[in-house]
A protein has these predicted regions:
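Alpha-helical transmembrane bundles and membrane-interface segments of multipass inner-membrane proteins
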Residues: 1-139
Length: 139
């Protein structure tokens, strides 16, 4: 595969993953009330949460969308630099997923002022903080 075709393929896959994240969030906004839990089974719920902070809602009290957008963008640019320098294909794959997830969550902050989280796992009364597909990509 030529270098150009390889880039186009990777770029297209990145766009699909970003679209999947954004589309899933918009489905939640359209069909789930804010803070509503929809039980799927004994350990999985769909919930509409607005995350004004960073991971797991941390620093939400210091909320400023533009600060998080700026910091997220700077970190993403730094990770892109590491990606470009890397020669290991598995490291590049992991970094690519982090970059894709970060870009998707930055898009959320730019257009909404917050990140939409909706995937909720729990065991009895212990709930893991809600997250989204972009968070899965980053993890």
């Amino acid at each position: 595969m030529s270098l150009k075709n390889n880039f186009v393929t990777k770029f297209f896959l990145a766009i699909i993953l970003i679209f999947l994240d954004i589309f899933s969030k918009q489905l939640v906004v359209r069909f789930v009330e804010l803070n509503q839990f929809i039980s799927i089974n004994f350990f999985f719920d769909i919930v509409y949460i607005r995350n004004y902070g960073i991971s797991f809602g941390l620093l939400a009290d210091l909320y400023s969308a533009w600060i998080f957008i700026l910091i997220g963008t700077l970190i993403t640019v730094f990770i892109i630099f590491i990606y470009i320098q890397s020669m290991d294909k598995f490291e590049k794959l992991g970094l690519a997923f982090i970059i894709i997830g970060a870009i998707s969550n930055i898009i959320d902050r730019i257009f909404n002022g917050f990140v939409i989280d909706f995937i909720s796992f729990h065991y009895k009364e212990f709930y893991w903080p809600a997250f989204n597909f972009a968070d899965i990509y980053i993890s």
